[in-house]
Amino acid sequence: MAHARLFTDTRVINMITWSGTKKIKDIFEGYKNNSDTEEGGITSMNDKLNIRPRYQRLYIRENDKVWKDNLINSIICKFPINRVYFGVFEENGVESYELLDGQQRLITICEFLNGKESITINGDELAFAALPDDIKEDILNYEIDVTYCKGDEDARIKWFKRINQPNSILTEQEFLDRVPA
């Protein structure tokens, strides 16, 4: 485990971090996308992973077929994909997680497994259920690199801003829209 020290406004934010892997099938377990309902949440790992914490932006890859196909094809080809970051906290004595980075990837993967997305392979549109069993198993057993970040909510939000800063994709307004003042 490493101790990360984030310097923000002359304050030090302490977090404990460690790395590991998670199989896609373990992340997908109990996946629920209620983003179109009043509940509005997206969870997996039997409600232990909040894929869209309040500070995350909305899913922006909905119409980006090439990006989604490339992601799933990378997994099928066993190419590495970018790591994801889980914020770790305790809720009612149970260790739970919220996704700090990797929302677009995890939603795309879970929606594909759920049958809501298909991919183009050799010109054919295929849903997960239509794939050969060995490819389905390879996808489900694919291991995603995870960095776990344990700290209070303020530290997790600061960490989220820090790891998303180099991408310059998340605008300050997008961040302000997601986090109440």
Describe each region flagged by the PLM.
Residues 4-22, 29, 56-62, 69-181:
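Basic- and aromatic-enriched surface patches that contact anionic nucleotides/nucleic acids
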Residues 11, 15-50:
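N- or domain-start disorder-to-order transition segments that initiate the globular core
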